[in-house]
Structure formats: structure tokens, C-alpha cells
A protein has these predicted regions:
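N-terminal active-site segment of His-dependent metallophosphoesterases
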Residues: 1-20
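His/acidic metal-ligating clusters that form di-metal
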Residues: 4, 39, 98, 104-107, ...
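Divalent metal-coordination and catalytic microenvironments
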Residues: 8, 13, 26, 45, ...
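Active-site metal-binding loops of divalent metal-dependent hydrolases
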Residues: 12-14, 46-48, 110-111, 150-152, ...
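Short catalytic/ligand-binding loop motif for oxyanion handling, primarily in non-cytosolic enzymes
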Residues: 16-19, 49-53, 114-116, 154-157, ...
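Acidic-and-aromatic substrate-binding clefts and catalytic sites of carbohydrate-active enzymes
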Residues: 16-21, 85-87, 162-163, 218-221
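Extended active-site neighborhood of metal-dependent phosphoesterases/phosphodiesterases
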Residues: 25-129, 206-207, 227
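Binuclear metal-dependent phosphoesterase catalytic core
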Residues: 99, 204-234
């Protein structure tokens, strides 16, 4: 609250295993931030929707509890990005948020939860088309777009090498770089990482490539977060 950022961006995994009661309680905490003047933007992570592992724990006893559907997720977190969205994708929980006159935030839902919850992620075809339309519009107006997804755009971990990178990441990178997108924010790994996309080995470090910044899940100890400051070159 004291830092007063332009927005708090949460790239998914808002709960342990998609428990409805946890979503509801977490949304209550986020309302405190919005009441203090900090806009909050959320998208789901692979833990958050249609999760059959949703559980309550009483001592050593585990009881399965209700998770949430995509529609319920959007209803619970409606005031944290969705209600203020300038545009929404036709086939996912992705949306575009206008941060200010020069910056848009594109919240991309990369999760697979229909008909069941899966760990890996993909950007649906309709969302890819919508994504490029938004980027094209922003580019023509000189506006910077910061895309955010739960799953990763690149292979950033030698430990977690499966089900982390967006299935159609190559296509997504081509679209992002077509419009000189500066950075992609992601989660999923629950660590802090940063990497620049290189088109081919040995490429000069001065050649443009989209950067990716991975941030930890805010709800999981040690509850790490990152601060992104945007400055115009020159």
C-alpha cells in the first residue's frame, strides 16, 4: 500500500489448488488494496480453476472441497481487471487493461481447464488473433503493451523442464516481436528469473529480442514480488 504502484499484477496461482473459499477470501484481501488506491489485475494459474485437488485440511485429515469454474473465477475477481477491461478475448479469460495514456497491460489466460484442469498451457487460437489485433492497434498509436501470462514464453529453468513453456510459444514470440513488445511477465515456476529471447545462437546482444521476467507467486512463502519501473529510452 505504501509504495502506491500504478497496478499490482498477479500472474496466476492465486490459491493452492483452486479452492473456492480461498478465492473468495483472497479477493477480500485484494479489495483492501483497491480501497487504498492500488488497482489489481489478475489472471488464473493452472492451480486455480476446475482443480480436482481442491482441499480443506483439519489436522492430518484432508477433505475435498469445491473448486471454481471459469465463470465463477471471473465473477469472484470481476473487479480486479475484468470490469475495467478495454477489450476481452473471445475464447479465454484474457483481457486488455489501459494502465495510462502510454501503456497497456495485456493479461493473457494461458491455462487449460476445460474439460479438466491440466498443468501445461497454451494461448487459444481466438486469443492469438485478438492479441495481435490489440498489439497492432497499440503499435499504430505509439503505445507500449506489457503482456502477462501464467506460463512461460521461454525455457527458463533447468530443473523444471516440462509443462512450463506455452505450447505455441514460438508463434506467440513472433507476434510479440513483430510489434517490438519490450517484455513479457510470467509466473508458474514460482521463482524469480529474467531472460532475453535470442533468435539464434551467437546473435549480437544488441539485437532486439523480447525480455521475459518470471515472478514468484505472491501467496506462497516467502511471498516474493517484483517491482517493474518503465522508462522511455532517451
Amino acid at each position: 500500500k505504501e509504495a502506491r504502484p500504478d497496478a499490482l499484477i498477479l500472474s496466476g496461482d492465486l490459491t493452492l489448488d483452486g479452492e473456492k473459499v480461498n478465492h473468495q477470501e483472497f479477493a477480500g484481501r485484494l479489495r483492501e488494496l483497491e480501497a487504498a488506491g492500488v488497482p489489481v489485475l489478475v489472471i488464473p494459474g493452472n492451480h486455480d480453476i476446475n482443480n480436482h485437488n481442491a482441499s480443506a485440511y483439519f489436522g492430518d485429515e484432508r477433505t475435498y472441497v469445491e473448486s471454481v469454474s471459469p465463470e465463477e473465477f471471473k465473477e469472484i475477481y470481476g473487479e480486479f481487471g475484468y470490469a475495467e477491461a478495454a477489450s476481452q478475448a473471445p475464447d479465454s479469460l484474457s483481457y486488455l487493461y489501459i494502465l495510462n495514456d502510454t501503456t497497456w497491460v495485456m493479461m493473457l489466460d494461458t491455462c487449460i481447464y476445460n474439460p479438466e484442469n491440466l498443468v501445461y498451457g497454451v494461448i487459444p487460437e481466438g486469443t492469438l488473433v485478438w492479441m495481435e489485433q490489440c498489439l497492432q492497434s497499440a503499435y499504430s498509436q505509439g503505445i507500449t503493451v506489457i503482456p502477462v501470462g501464467h506460463h512461460n514464453l521461454q525455457e527458463l529453468s533447468r530443473v523444471y523442464v516440462e509443462e512450463c513453456v506455452i505450447e505455441n510459444h514460438r508463434e506467440a514470440i513472433k507476434i510479440f516481436e513483430r510489434y517490438l513488445t519490450p517484455v513479457f511477465l510470467s509466473g508458474h515456476l514460482h521463482v524469480q528469473r529474467i531472460m532475453k529471447h535470442i533468435s539464434e545462437p551467437g546473435e549480437d546482444s544488441d539485437v532486439y529480442g523480447i525480455w521475459e521476467i518470471v515472478s514468484n507467486s505472491l501467496i506462497i512463502p516467502p511471498c516474493q514480488y517484483g517491482i517493474l519501473n518503465l522508462h522511455k529510452d532517451g
